[in-house]
Amino acid sequence: MNVRPEQIPYRDFYRILLSSVAPRPIAWVSTLNKGHLNLAPFSFFNAVSAKPPMLGFSPSLRLVDGQSAPKDTLHNIRETREFVVNVVTFAVADAMNLTSGDYDSSVDEFALAKLTTRPSQLVRPPQVAESPVSFECKLNRIIDFGTEPPSGSLVIGEIVCVHLEDNVLKEGRLDPDSLDLIGRMSGTQYSRTTNRFDLKRPEVQPPETPHSRK
């Protein structure tokens, strides 16, 4: 079976995309604009560079009164050029889900989900105190893919500071068991990172050169 995006309804291809690109890590993004706190999860998310350290996530456009409009997260980042990406653990899954609603921009999702703010060091938006790892980011660039919903934009931010809770560190490294991260599947399904296995990378010898044979 071969499928071309233009040959089937958008929703059908969307289901194929989200069911096969999974599990996806979740960026729980906190922003601040004109005194209003905003917090929302995005599963089109990943690390995109190690040096300089960059994270990227993709919020989609939405319809407001019949007009195309950016989500509050994207609007706030365009205005302030700062945001925080908080990781999502199993313990806060319900709170994360509660913040995913399409609320009015005046709604404080921290208060709605009964979450605690933790001051950031180098950016204005606060962190989610219940999240054990929070990345403070400065906007690097935004790439827009369209002007009509559900087109998205790729937001890339440079990490300027990262907060790590001591209770998820073991011998100076992040411990996956203590982190207990979750990932997004399709529909209402999520996955938990408790069933893991190890694979060692293959050892590949460099090819011989005339210089190395001497």
Segments and roles (model prediction):
Residues M1-K214:
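Basic, polyanion-binding surface patches
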